[in-house]
UniProtKB/Swiss-Prot annotation:
It is an enzyme of class 3 (hydrolase). The keyword Metal-binding applies. Monomer. Binds crRNA and tracrRNA. GO terms for molecular function: DNA binding; endonuclease activity; RNA binding; zinc ion binding. Gene3D superfamilies: 3.30.70.3520, Ribonuclease H-like superfamily/Ribonuclease H (3.30.420.10). Mn(2+) 1 binds at D17, H736. Residues 253-273 are annotated as: Disordered. It comes from Actinomyces naeslundii (strain ATCC 12104 / DSM 43013 / CCUG 2238 / JCM 8349 / NCTC 10301 / Howell 279). This is CRISPR-associated endonuclease Cas9. The simplicity of the Cas9-gRNAs RNA-directed DNA endonuclease activity may be used to target and modify a DNA sequence of interest.
Amino acid sequence: MWYASLMSAHHLRVGIDVGTHSVGLATLRVDDHGTPIELLSALSHIHDSGVGKEGKKDHDTRKKLSGIARRARRLLHHRRTQLQQLDEVLRDLGFPIPTPGEFLDLNEQTDPYRVWRVRARLVEEKLPEELRGPAISMAVRHIARHRGWRNPYSKVESLLSPAEESPFMKALRERILATTGEVLDDGITPGQAMAQVALTHNISMRGPEGILGKLHQSDNANEIRKICARQGVSPDVCKQLLRAVFKADSPRGSAVSRVAPDPLPGQGSFRRAPKCDPEFQRFRIISIVANLRISETKGENRPLTADERRHVVTFLTEDSQADLTWVDVAEKLGVHRRDLRGTAVHTDDGERSAARPPIDATDRIMRQTKISSLKTWWEEADSEQRGAMIRYLYEDPTDSECAEIIAELPEEDQAKLDSLHLPAGRAAYSRESLTALSDHMLATTDDLHEARKRLFGVDDSWAPPAEAINAPVGNPSVDRTLKIVGRYLSAVESMWGTPEVIHVEHVRDGFTSERMADERDKANRRRYNDNQEAMKKIQRDYGKEGYISRGDIVRLDALELQGCACLYCGTTIGYHTCQLDHIVPQAGPGSNNRRGNLVAVCERCNRSKSNTPFAVWAQKCGIPHVGVKEAIGRVRGWRKQTPNTSSEDLTRLKKEVIARLRRTQEDPEIDERSMESVAWMANELHHRIAAAYPETTVMVYRGSITAAARKAAGIDSRINLIGEKGRKDRIDRRHHAVDASVVALMEASVAKTLAERSSLRGEQRLTGKEQTWKQYTGSTVGAREHFEMWRGHMLHLTELFNERLAEDKVYVTQNIRLRLSDGNAHTVNPSKLVSHRLGDGLTVQQIDRACTPALWCALTREKDFDEKNGLPAREDRAIRVHGHEIKSSDYIQVFSKRKKTDSDRDETPFGAIAVRGGFVEIGPSIHHARIYRVEGKKPVYAMLRVFTHDLLSQRHGDLFSAVIPPQSISMRCAEPKLRKAITTGNATYLGWVVVGDELEINVDSFTKYAIGRFLEDFPNTTRWRICGYDTNSKLTLKPIVLAAEGLENPSSAVNEIVELKGWRVAINVLTKVHPTVVRRDALGRPRYSSRSNLPTSWTIE
């Protein structure tokens, strides 16, 4: 902290650049005039957006895959527990549990359909007393293991009464009729049906092609009732059996006990309300409306009166389906949009509306649901009933009235309930507090801050506790970013003190999942292809040569969409005679260049309208056929022109254009907040950082600001990154740190000027006006002076950044995974094991591929086992595995990936485990690799790849020093020389590495093969990242600084190493140059010691 006190005389500014798979971080020290003095820290942190190798294809996150594995484990555990409880119930009721091999008729022991025959006989005839109990047990236990489907919202009590034959049972009848031609009797049970079919036909019963298919639990419950009736079992005992067989515990509501209490004084007995609760939706709308102010003639801003508030709240809540704008709100209040202030102000809880007014999101979801019966109920229910239903669906399954309503829904509608995605998260207060605050704000002119003071007696400094910066939100990609930002800011504060300014910039997909970002990329590619086709059409059909601008493409699109008619007057226009016009102009410099504000018009209308809103001009222009009603009619006649244009996109565009045509006020001019992001997660991050650093100025900008800033300052040609000068080249990952440094120096006035420049640029390129936007530096003298001063600061920043680059202190970091993670064995179809007769002899390779460690131990402990040749053939051989004797005539099973026709005697051992009667490979689930030096006259180096499976039993200890026994799959897959050295104590354990570790390598001696050719193009590439362990003796490395996305026409060697396989290097070759394993702290500095037992850097000696 001595350094922090020394720095306190200066000013710290932190910049954060959030991307989809990266976070750029930078800390600057500036003087009193804002001139950068020192670049204290600059790094690019690369992350995987929460998606591992197993989920890369479908963009499935680790969280999703681990959730599937966790639920699979819980399901199996729960199923075992339920079956054990069923056995106890059967014993208590006097039904003995049949032991293996015991059966009604010894002649039927090998009959695969015997349990189906028993179920059929129990329904058709009354069995003797001595057979009745075991038979009922067998049938009930079989049904319990295949009990069928039941809607999770229906209770087990619904099965206690007889039910009609389900649609699943009717479908079974149809399948049997189509397959066998047999017509089943009415009232037949599933057991009878299968026994009848199995007796007479050779068909598959289960599986994807099986005839049994899916059954409803009511069908099996009907069979149990018939069995009990036929065998003389009392109704009470029958009901006990039904409850035990079909018992189910719903997980809904299990997390309510962990919800935090209301933080307001006196409200601690209430839990925080879910954000999907209608009461929170109402509170959010009212609290944002309470922030609104109306600018009056004297320059003062007054709050809305109580009547005005109620008027606006009613307007916003009466129709959640409407796409309202703040212009609509202003018109409802009878004021100009420019006089309505406070639309972008945060409430005291950090809530902030986006570009549009707030709506009741829950109400919109319920009114748009495809569950028609629930939608109808919602529209007829009152507010109290709606709130109860939302709580029932979200967290509280105890409401009996709601349960009855859900139970009455058609079964197909009940099945859709799980697809109903309500707003997630928790409000800061309880439902009771939300109601009190909403009612108070609606009845007075108090905002949320004043309402809290009056109702709960808190002072001006009180605020609800905010989440920690790195607290997870549930989205793996966002959680990665939050954790990185939280750790970095904590390290900056610890090292240099509290920053005065923290600026965050994020790309559009920076706070979304990888799947969403990929879908948006696909949409962008489709749009790009459409634009390419439009450019070809303009050149081919209209004879335009040279550069084709975006304005040309938009003009063609508008012309075709409008049917070659001027939108304003209907006159026929052509490509060369039409002009683009902004329906609603923007106050100040620039224009709103969104597609919904651009239409093709004739020269006469464009010249006459000038910079006037269409609705105002249409009333007084005097041109025939010009009017709001006529223009809207033309818009409603639009039809989509390209295959890639969806009907939803066209409907959205038409709705936006119609709204613009009706508007009578010009768009407000760009202000200093115009470039601040309004994305939900950006607001949340802003709120968390501001709560953690209350004295710090925090702003969150859109990504376009940084791009405009780099170009305006001209720094792309001055930064010494790898790649082409004069443009942002993505081949060098350190460009994220550049962006973070740029956004750290951003100021509100400069952001406003940059936004105005971008708006002018778009307007001039679309309309073909003279390109003057590059000379624009501000609308006032002060703004221009400030902009020029900022340019000077940016040039000085480039010098500081280049100094850090020259010193190799702009770091590229990446987190490493040290804890045990789930594999994908539960999702992979097992491969078949290969059988070998024990007496025929086995090679060492076959023994190392033994399907279990116990089998390997038994084989290698034979007296005639040879480490090179394995076991010779011997007819008197006998081994014991898990207490069972295996003789020479018996068969043992081993892993093998070869075809049945190929010999596996020399097949190399590989990572696999036995599951579900087969085996699955576990190659991707290597936890870490241990580096050993094998001592001798000339020491050699080797590595032991440690599979996660071999560490499960030691998951609560030190995984990197855990003993790896000889029978483990890790040791069996290691190099023979290493296995022997470890056994004889001749191997020295030097340290461990994991995927993601950084290696600093002296590459001067690597001049051959692909790596040599790569280094000719990119010399002095000394920092590499471990990407995998290709074999038991080779590492796969890729350069840390270089990114594949920036490659353009690379050589084959560069393409192979950067984008494809990487540099595959033998561990014994690599260790000869004694590389250093570099572990870094949150600021990117190498860590050589740690009091918290964090991984430290070390050199392979």
